[in-house]
Amino acid sequence: MAWVVDTSVLLDVRMNDATFGLASAQCLAAHLRDGLVISPVTYMELAPAFDGDARLQEQFLERNGVAWLEPWIHADTERGHRLWADQVKRKRTGQGSKRPVADVFIEAFAKRFQGLITRNPADFKTVPVVVP
């Protein structure tokens, strides 16, 4: 079963980040045999790194063995709905930290897969994570 790749890991590779680039690239290579996918949210978040050129972005993803056409399904919406409601409830009671809704969408999407490859494991508590 495939792994979902978080935006930060792909940006590490794209930007050849001095701190995280090599580890992120090696992590992707190590999980390639299981399959690598991104959520529609990550597809959108990557756009600025390619100046909005979808063709260049898709070439980068293809070179790195990452599928980008996996659809968002209603079950993802239902999971996201629950995750976001829980997040807001915790925040209102002072038990949660500020969290972008994009992370909730990525986590909801990742629940259908083996887990999430991310540098931010604390942001994704309901799915298995691999940190490069």
Language-model region placement:
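Acidic, PIN/NYN-like endoribonuclease modules and their adjacent C-terminal/linker elements
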Residues: 2, 107-132
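Short, structured coil segments at secondary-structure junctions
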Residues: 62-64, 127
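Phosphate- and divalent-cation-binding pockets in alpha/beta enzyme and binding domains
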Residues: 45-46, 79, 126
